[in-house]
Amino acid sequence: MSNFIRRLVGKMKAISTGTNAIVSKKDSIYANWSKEQLIRRITELENANKPHSEKFQHIEDNKKRKISQEEVTRSKAKKAPKKFDFSKHNTRFIALRFAYLGWNYNGLAVQKEYTPLPTVEGTILEAMNKCKLVPSMVLQDYKFSRCGRTDKGVSAMNQVISLEVRSNLTDEEQRDPTNDSREIPYVHVLNQLLPDDIRISAVCLRPPPNFDARFSCVHRHYKYIFNGKNLNIEKMSKAASYFVGERDFRNFCKLDGSKQITNFKRTIISSKILPLSETFYCFDLVGSAFLWHQVRCMMAILFLVGQSLEVPEIVLRLTDIEKTPQRPVYEMANDIPLLLYDCKFPEMDWQEPTVDDYKAIKFTTATEALTLHYELKAAVCNIFKDVLPTANTNNFSKTIINLGDGRGKVVGTYVKLEDRSVMEPVEVVNAKYSKKKNNKNK
């Protein structure tokens, strides 16, 4: 509404209320107009203003249409890229060898449920999915298999997985090794996407027929690193030797009812205590297959022997199911010092990055930097330890059971394994799980 019309409306109000309005010279011609005359004049003026208002409205509408069109154009520009169609690409079955430091991960195997830390496999498969080597995170989609599962905190140096991945070559071209240089550089591509504590070390482009990373493995080689301070290494070596051969290891593992395992016999090929330096040793263990937490349980018993809390022959007693049908209650050794050192397979053609390749040098430098990072932290920790007062533990009356983590477990009076309470037998654990599963499915 224009100022002029507002003045006319004000005049109308003055007339209707009978008040004496102060009128300007510009408005004096309307002083004696009646209410009806003023209304007619207002109507005339409003009608005269309409074309002007419609003109501006038309301009405003055009602006809105232009903005709307620009938004549509931008939306098209930001449109999601076309979905990658795996059916239009060749695939091939390969094996990958890799190493990882386990303390930043929630174990090797990818999990269906949420985990507080990422898993090693999950990290690798996410990298593969990102660069379109695999179509999804569903393992069954590409014949996935792993050699040896490792738990949270445990590392591996020569872990192996086998799976089907995208390829640049046809089936016929894949059979000819002269075409390998035209293949996707799997090691380089993945290492560019993976964190520094997971590294692909080699690829086998043509695994043996019917190869499976789990079932084709001949044996697995573990190492458990420990500080030899206050331990009788000779006794530990004797106890370790008793593990060799086929033995029942139900008292050296964590029972898992979901697996419904009834055969706990496993073959140990080699079991030794080896020196690494003046301070550190390793429990060096080679076997065909292992049970859940088996190595950590074996190491826990070796620590008890090394502290002279148990005799070396306790190994023979615990592997004799007639004498010890149920596992005594004891704590496993710490997870961090354990590593899956190697996985032995039939002869395979592993292709490693060439040492003079720029990318290989780049990844080697990153690994050296990571190693230096931990060495510097260790050096700082040693200085930290040296500047702090040291307590005299010689008069400490309680026993500290060595678990490999430097802290151990404090107990008032040590109870021999043969005198401890025992865990439920295998048959009960399996039956409980089966009953629970059946009730859930009803």
Curated annotation (Swiss-Prot):
One of its GO terms (biological process) is tRNA pseudouridine synthesis. One of its GO terms (cellular component) is cytoplasm. It is found in: Nucleus. This is tRNA pseudouridine(38/39) synthase. It holds the Pfam family PseudoU_synth_1. The gene is DEG1. Signal peptide: none annotated. Keywords: Isomerase, Nucleus, tRNA processing. The lineage of its organism: Eukaryota, Fungi, Dikarya, Ascomycota, Saccharomycotina. Belongs to the tRNA pseudouridine synthase TruA family. CDD domains: PseudoU_synth_ScPus3 (cd02569). It comes from the Eukaryota. It comes from Saccharomyces cerevisiae (strain ATCC 204508 / S288c). Formation of pseudouridines at positions 38 and 39 in the anticodon stem and loop of transfer RNAs.
